[in-house]
């Protein structure tokens, strides 16, 4: 796709400085951009490239305009503007076009207008596909599941039975939604499987990365609210509830029946205990282990930041003696108290 800088300015509501007729074809970094590309400056540490960039135009703040040597669009937030332009110029191919003859689709499947199904996909009985839904090659959609309008499944996504996915969702390859939750009872050392009878309900505008697993509920449904974004390799166990607008980075793990509030940010490789509740607007940094409910918004962390190996080994060795040091300090305090009383 090509667009003029003037059209981009109108699309973004930006202030144009320069040639409105210059053609923009792609978006690029300031350092490597060439003619026909638009760069962006959202971090002041890259200001030096404003003087040397070969970009045809730059997205920037008003404070940086004087340093720019090429056409510019002045915006309030260059990074948000970059995201909008990237959407406009997106050249990602669709997961599927039309319905491939090798796709296996049950006779009673309800196909909306403009549905596309890729090669070797399997759509089972009772499924409803909304208008413009796209099913990539090799996908499986189980009985009585529903995929909303304009939602996309990339290749080899597995959707089990009785899963509901809303409108404008995106699921990347390898993800499994609706597999059995990890539910077992133990009778004198023998594990008794508990059939997982709930489903999964995913809202609108939800994006899920590759190789993420969202398990079905044991009795009630596992629920993902609208506008949630989930990275790759995450594990969401049965009956978990993720609140509106929450962002979850890669490899985060949520044990069963945990509830995450609205507008939370979950760092990569974080681990959440089961049956706890996290209130709205909580940020948990990467590698944190959350064992108890959080009732106050804010920033939460655990774990040891990276050190040199030598420093880390010293720290680890000293932690083994914390209990002994505590006892010694307590004894010293008692001795000091006795001396003060004399």
Curated annotation (Swiss-Prot):
Reactions performed catalytically: a UDP-3-O-[(3R)-3-hydroxyacyl]-alpha-D-glucosamine + a (3R)-hydroxyacyl-[ACP] = a UDP-2-N,3-O-bis[(3R)-3-hydroxyacyl]-alpha-D-glucosamine + holo-[ACP] + H(+)
E.C. designation(s): 2.3.1.191
Active site residues of this protein: 238 (proton acceptor)
Record-linked Gene3D superfamilies: 1.20.5.170, Hexapeptide repeat proteins (2.160.10.10), MurE/MurF, N-terminal domain (3.40.1390.10)
Function noted in UniProt: Catalyzes the N-acylation of UDP-3-O-acylglucosamine using 3-hydroxyacyl-ACP as the acyl donor. Is involved in the biosynthesis of lipid A, a phosphorylated glycolipid that anchors the lipopolysaccharide to the outer membrane of the cell.
GO terms assigned for molecular function: N-acyltransferase activity
Pathway it works in: Bacterial outer membrane biogenesis; LPS lipid A biosynthesis
GO terms (BP aspect): lipid A biosynthetic process
Name of the protein described by the UniProt record: UDP-3-O-acylglucosamine N-acyltransferase
PROSITE patterns to which the protein is assigned, alphabetical: HEXAPEP_TRANSFERASES
Keywords from the UniProt entry: Acyltransferase, Lipid A biosynthesis, Lipid biosynthesis, Lipid metabolism, Repeat, Transferase
Organism: Tolumonas auensis (strain DSM 9187 / NBRC 110442 / TA 4)
Gene Ontology terms: cellular component: membrane
């Amino acid at each position: 796709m090509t667009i003029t800088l003037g059209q981009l300015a109108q699309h973004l509501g930006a202030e144009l400085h320069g040639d409105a007729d210059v053609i923009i074809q792609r978006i690029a970094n300031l350092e490597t951009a060439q003619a026909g590309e638009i760069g962006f400056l959202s971090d002041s540490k890259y200001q030096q490239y404003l003087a040397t960039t070969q970009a045809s135009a730059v997205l920037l703040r008003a404070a940086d305009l004087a340093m720019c040597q090429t056409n510019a669009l002045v915006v309030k937030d260059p990074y948000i503007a970059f995201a909008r332009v990237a959407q406009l110029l997106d050249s990602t191919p669709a997961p599927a076009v039309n319905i491939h003859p090798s796709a296996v689709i049950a006779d009673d499947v309800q196909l909306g207008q403009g549905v596309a199904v890729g090669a070797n996909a399997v759509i089972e009985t009772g499924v409803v596909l909304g208008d413009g839904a796209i099913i990539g090659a090799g996908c499986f959609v189980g009985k009585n599941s529903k995929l909303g309008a304009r939602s996309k499944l990339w290749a080899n996504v597995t959707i089990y039975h009785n899963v509901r996915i809303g409108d404008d969702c995106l699921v990347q390859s390898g993800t499994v939604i609706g597999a059995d939750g990890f539910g077992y009872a133990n009778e004198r050392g023998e594990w008794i499987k508990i059939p997982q009878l709930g489903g999964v309900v995913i809202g609108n505008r939800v994006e899920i990365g590759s190789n993420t697993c969202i398990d079905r509920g044991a009795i009630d449904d596992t629920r993902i609210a609208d506008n949630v974004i989930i990275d790759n390799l995450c594990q969401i166990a049965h009956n978990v509830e993720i609140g509106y607008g929450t962002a979850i980075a890669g490899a985060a793990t949520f044990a069963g029946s945990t509830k995450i509030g609205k507008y939370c940010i979950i760092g990569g490789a974080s681990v959440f205990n089961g049956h706890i509740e996290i209130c709205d607007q909580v940020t948990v940094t990467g590698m944190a282990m959350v064992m108890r409910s959080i009732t106050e918004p804010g920033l939460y962390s655990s774990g040891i930041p990276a050190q040199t190996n030598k420093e880390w080994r010293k720290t680890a060795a000293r932690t083994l003696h914390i209990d002994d040091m505590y006892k010694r300090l307590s004894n010293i305090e008692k001795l000091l108290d006795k001396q003060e009383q004399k």
